[in-house]
Amino acid sequence: AGATHAILQMGINDIGFQLAWTPNEKATAADLINSIASAVAAAKAMGIQVYLTTMTPFKGHVYFSDPGEQIRQEVNAWIRTNTEVSGVFDFDAAVRDPAEPARILAAYRGADSLHLNDLGYLRVTESIDLDKLR
């Protein structure tokens, strides 16, 4: 109660855990987009301004795969062009390695290559335009 804004970051575990799922359980880019759109619609129906974040890279993590990276890219492209939300914070652009965009830049990468380290979390925090949340 009382929330006016929400920042949604969704999808990376749905991509990664597919290695353990049966073919019928695997999420496609369209599945993830539909799930995110549903969450956005639910929040907006409650009068909440919604902001999305792009999914950060995860190459080097045990559940990285090329098909999973393709899904991440497709969903991120949709997020970046989404007109149903109040804004987008591009965490992918903030922390990716320019030489290898499927990987988090070493300075920001946690030990598992999926999560950020303290400097990485600081970097994504700095990439949020706080004026949009006022």
Ranges and model annotations:
Residues H5-L8, L32-V40, Y51, N117-V124, ...:
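Structured catalytic/translocation cores of nucleotide/phosphate-coupled proteins
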Residues A37-T53, Y63-P67:
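N-terminal/domain-start segments enriched in small and hydrophobic, helix-friendly residues
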Residues T4-M10, I48-T54, G87-D90, H115:
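Structural recognition of the beta-strand scaffold that forms the well-ordered cores
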Residues P23-D31, S35, Y63-I71:
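Alpha-helix N-cap and loop-to-helix initiation/capping positions
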Residues A1-A30:
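Oxyanion-hole/transition-state-stabilizing segment in secreted/luminal serine hydrolases
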Residues D31-A41, A45, E74-W78:
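Alpha-helical scaffolding segments of alpha/beta enzyme cores, especially the outer helices
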Residues G16-Q18, M55-R134:
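Catalytic His-Asp segment of secreted/periplasmic serine-dependent ester chemistry enzymes
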Residues A1-G2, A41-A42, M46, L133-R134:
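Surface-exposed acidic, glycine-flexible loop patches that form ligand/cofactor-binding
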